From Swiss-Prot:
It is found in: Cytoplasm. This is Uncharacterized protein C3orf22 homolog. Residues 119-129 have a biased composition (Polar residues). Residues 110-137 are annotated as: Disordered. One of its GO terms (cellular component) is cytoplasm. Keywords: Cytoplasm. Its main location: cytoplasm.
Amino acid sequence: MDSKGHKKPCRHKKKEIKTYERFVKKFPYRLPHLTEPSTSCPPSCKAKSNSLKDKLPLQKNLVPTRSIPIPGLGAPQVAWPFSFYSPPPHPPLCNLWELKLLQLRFPTQDLPRLPPLQTPDNQPLTSGISKPPESIP
């Protein structure tokens, strides 16, 4: 007769399994080797969710807002002091022809007009800088 096959499991093993099953029931997360997952939330989870709901204020009038306000709506336009808005300094004379060309291509009303170029015919316009192209597209 085979004596090893008919042995009962020892009490220590039974107690260990029972303790493990109790632990699994109290543990809030599902373990992959459990037989059946419980559909109800553990009591500690219910207690936490109720207490958090009680602490939060009820906010019924939440309105979506824009992070960048539409001009004319929302915050008023800020009028900066005069010291912050000062006209740019006059450009150096060596780049005057470039600025004239830019003014012709991109006219703006808020910039002051540059004085006309007054150089002798035999002198180059600038020293060391190439002349502007003869034809303006």
